[in-house]
Every structure is written in structure tokens, then in C-alpha cells.
């Protein structure tokens, strides 16, 4: 089976392609330079050329604040492009689609984890476009799988974890938001779960693909400092109001994982366990070894 990965140059896309290659899977890895998923003719041509057994859509507009002033651009990539992919795959019933979505489709005012079937009510332009993308995919291709995830970090790309590593190296104290709660999620675990879903063609609909447990940004920053053998007391709690941004951030965006029970697949493990395993690779990517004889 051939896998076609859109957004293959992004943080999640790179990790997914790497793990598929390690498993000796047949992969067509297409970044934006190779496939503009917003162009109908380009999508049709890519599907015809590569003839994938499954498509994983990692392409997304993720500039949450910029979307507030350019919702049309966000909608093009987050809603229209997924629709094009789903419609392109619809005539080929044996071909599957895994589409990545976000916790931002919920309002973020709950006190218990959001179930997969909880009504969506996004409060940001970014969240609205991702909600519209989910609906477009499942309308055009009911056999598709939508995986909602959140708070991603990985060995490459920008993330909160990498930012905390850099801030710790500068020394001194740092103020971190302690009144927003979510689920830090490692791209390695998410990539493994995407592969598992792709190999189980009976898994359809919406699933929540975040690492288990929950944390505030403050909790996550302290854990990063501990893994660096630094004093977590240097991380000071503050409120989200101290960092004013154009787009509202969810105060509570913990996702429930109940639907995994009916799939035969396990949900992702606890976020602390995942972070501990991922950390050496993140540090290695942050400070790659110098080749002998290199200038």
C-alpha cells in the first residue's frame, strides 16, 4: 500500500514520513513545493500520479493569530483543501483519508474532557476553519478518519518544548501561563497512531489523538526544566491575560479518548512518559554533533 503524505515538510509530516520509511512502507512525501493542496488540478494530478492506498493530510494553516485577520487564507488550507482531497478520493472506495484537526474546534470552557461527539463551538477564526475542514471531509468521504490533536512538539520544527529548552539556556526566571490546560502531544506517538489507523481500514469518524493526562503550560515548562536538570523553580506561574494575543486561547482543551475502545487500538500514553522518551532526540536535534574535521 502506498501512503501519500501532504504537508510532509512540517513537524508532524517529517516524523510520519520518517517512521513510515523505517517500516519500509511505500511513501510519497509531498510538501508544499511538490503539491499545492488548495489547487483542484494539482490535487487531481497528485492522486492520479501516485495512486495512494491512503492519504494523510498533515497540511494546515497553523498561524492562529494571523487567521484572525486573514480567515480566508486559513479557510483555503484548512477547509477547502481537505474537501478537495476527500472528493478526489471518493471515486476510489478502497482509498482512505486520515485528516488532522485540533482541540480549537471546542470553546475551551469545559471542566471535564471533551468527548469526540461533543458539539463544536470554536471561538477563533483558526478553530472555525478547522471545524469546517472536519465537516467537509466527513461529508465528502464518510469513511475518512479525523484525528484531533493538540499541543504538538517533535524532534524538528518550532514548539513550546523547544522554546523552553532555549529559554532555560539563557538563564534567569521565566513567566509561563498556568491557567490554560491541555495535552502535550509528541509527534512520534501521534505518527505511530496514524500508521496504526491507516492499517485498520475499519476505523472511521472522529478520534482524539492526544497524549493522555493533562497539563498547563506552566506544568509542561517545569517538566522540561527537570529533564534538563535545571531548577523548575525558575519557572513562574502567570495568567494568559499577561500575554495578550489576537486569537483567544482555550482555557481547558483536554480531549477524551473513549472512542479508541471500539477500534481495537489503544489511545496514546501519558504525556510525561512520552516527553521523557522524546527528550534525547529533541536535544540531539537542538545540538547536533559536530562532524570530525568540520570547520
UniProtKB/Swiss-Prot annotation:
Q: In which pathway does it act?
A: Antibiotic biosynthesis
What does the cofactor section's free text say about binding? Binds 1 Mg(2+) ion per monomer.
Single GO BP term: antibiotic biosynthetic process
GO CC, sorted alphabetically, is:
cytosol
Stored InterPro entries: dTDP_dehydrorham_reduct (IPR005913), NAD(P)-bd_dom_sf (IPR036291), RmlD-like-bd (IPR029903)
**Binding locations of NADPH:** 11-12, 36-37, 60-62, 126, 130
Q: Name one GO molecular function term.
A: metal ion binding
Q: What organism does this protein naturally occur in?
A: Streptomyces antibioticus
Site note Could provide a fine-tuning to achieve optimal pKa matching between active site and substrate, residues: 102
Question: What name is this protein filed under?
Answer: Probable dTDP-4,6-dihydroxy-2-methyloxan-3-one 4-ketoreductase
Q: Which family does it belong to?
A: Belongs to the dTDP-4-dehydrorhamnose reductase family.
Amino acid at each position: 500500500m502506498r501512503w501519500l503524505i501532504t504537508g510532509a515538510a512540517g513537524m508532524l509530516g517529517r516524523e510520519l514520513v520518517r517512521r513510515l520509511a523505517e517500516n519500509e512502507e511505500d511513501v510519497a512525501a509531498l510538501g508544499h513545493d511538490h503539491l499545492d493542496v488548495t489547487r483542484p488540478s494539482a490535487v487531481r494530478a497528485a492522486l492520479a500520479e501516485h495512486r495512494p492506498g491512503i492519504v494523510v493530510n498533515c497540511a494546515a494553516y497553523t498561524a492562529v493569530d494571523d487567521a484572525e485577520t486573514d480567515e480566508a487564507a486559513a479557510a483555503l488550507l484548512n477547509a477547502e483543501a481537505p474537501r478537495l482531497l476527500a472528493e478526489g478520493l471518493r471515486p476510489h472506495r478502497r482509498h482512505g483519508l486520515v485528516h488532522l484537526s485540533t482541540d480549537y474546534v471546542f470553546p475551551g470552557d469545559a471542566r471535564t474532557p471533551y468527548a469526540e461527539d461533543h458539539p463544536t463551538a470554536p471561538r477563533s477564526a483558526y478553530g472555525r476553519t478547522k471545524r469546517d475542514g472536519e465537516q467537509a471531509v466527513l461529508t465528502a468521504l464518510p469513511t475518512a478518519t479525523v484525528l484531533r490533536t493538540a499541543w504538538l512538539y517533535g524532534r524538528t520544527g518550532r514548539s513550546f518544548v523547544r522554546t523552553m529548552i532555549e529559554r532555560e539556556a539563557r538563564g534567569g526566571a521565566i513567566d509561563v501561563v498556568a491557567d490554560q490546560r491541555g495535552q502535550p502531544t509528541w509527534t512520534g506517538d501521534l505518527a505511530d497512531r496514524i500508521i496504526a489507523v491507516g492499517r485498520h481500514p475499519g476505523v472511521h469518524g472522529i478520534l482524539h489523538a492526544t497524549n493522555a493526562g493533562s497539563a498547563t503550560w506552566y506544568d509542561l515548562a517545569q517538566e522540561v526544566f527537570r529533564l534538563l536538570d535545571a531548577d523548575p523553580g525558575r519557572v513562574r506561574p502567570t495568567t494568559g491575560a499577561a500575554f495578550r494575543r489576537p486569537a483567544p486561547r482555550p482555557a481547558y482543551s483536554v480531549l477524551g479518548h473513549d472512542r479508541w475502545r471500539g477500534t481495537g487500538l489503544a489511545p496514546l500514553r501519558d504525556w510525561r512518559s512520552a516527553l521523557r522518551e522524546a527528550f534525547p532526540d529533541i536535544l540531539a536535534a537542538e545540538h547536533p554533533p559536530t562532524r570530525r574535521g568540520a570547520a
